[in-house]
Amino acid sequence: MSDGTSNAPTRKHTALPKAQILIEALPWLTRHHGKTVVIKFGGNAMIDEDLKAAFAQDVVFLRHAGLKPVVVHGGGPQISAALDKHGIVSEFKAGLRVTTEDAMDVVRMVLAGQVQRELVGLLNQHGPLAVGLTGEDAHTLTATKHQPEIDGELVDIGRVGEITEIDTGAIEALLADGRIPVVSSIARSQDDHHVYNVNADTAAAALAAALGAETLMVLTDVEGLYEDWPDSDEVISRLTASELEKLLPDLSSGMVPKMEGCLHAVRGGVTTARVIDGRVQHSILLEIFTDEGIGTMVVPDEQGES
């Protein structure tokens, strides 16, 4: 008579591959537990409804997995649309938006009143987690006028700021309370009583360094940093800060603030900075919790041989 413990074949459960995926994530969960990760939200992920929803899911997943996510956002597409609607001409110089006084009013309105509110709402569909603030709040970001150099000459690009000071107190208080800070890339002015538009890539990198973050993640509309664009679409999966510094002069203008941000972050003590394809749903989870990862990772020089 059988006791039910015969040598019958083990049933092949269809869910077993999911267990393997979870186990693959275990060492990464252990490594990142309790660590701060700053995520710059931008590109197509900001205007595609499915990508926005997936982004919110990823960030909330990080929070429940024991990480401390901080979201920094710009609003390029939304700002351009609003400026067109108000009949304000907008142009870019050195990869940065020229921001007149009139344009600054629109930038502030769109970032703090539209993009941030929508993102906070998406995150809070999963629980009372996200809190929105701008760099003005609690003096989180302070900036002075930024004048880039083009062909050897300083160029006036209006109310575009260069971050001079960061106060992480408000963000750290929110993280300690289990919240997800969502920061709009606007800074208070060190020079006058106005505000500055600051590049969101730059703001995210500066915040990551100031917070002592484990990781900076920058969402883009490309797969990562290409090895020899446009002659090759081979993505560089990993490089050191010094290797990146050598490549900077030859990068396209749109990638310069992103890669300069990554360089600043790792030189400022952030363990890794990653540029990932925001067009891929759940790219954040793929980058952090899988062996292969996705995109380009920048590491400090001393990690180059590891």
Swiss-Prot record:
UniProt keyword annotation of S-adenosyl-L-methionine present: no
Residues flagged as site, Transition state stabilizer: 40, 258
GO terms of biological process kind: arginine biosynthetic process via ornithine; L-arginine biosynthetic process
Keywords, comma-separated and alphabetical: Amino-acid biosynthesis, Arginine biosynthesis, ATP-binding, Cytoplasm, Kinase, Nucleotide-binding, Transferase
Protein EC: 2.7.2.8
Pathway annotation from the record: Amino-acid biosynthesis; L-arginine biosynthesis; N(2)-acetyl-L-ornithine from L-glutamate: step 2/4
Entry binding sites for substrate: 75-76, 97, 197
Subcellular location(s) of the protein: Cytoplasm
GO CC terms in record: cytoplasm
Organism superkingdom: Bacteria
GO MF assignments: acetylglutamate kinase activity; ATP binding
Function noted in UniProt: Catalyzes the ATP-dependent phosphorylation of N-acetyl-L-glutamate.
Family per similarity comment: Belongs to the acetylglutamate kinase family. ArgB subfamily.
Name assigned to this protein: Acetylglutamate kinase
Gene transcribed to yield this protein: argB
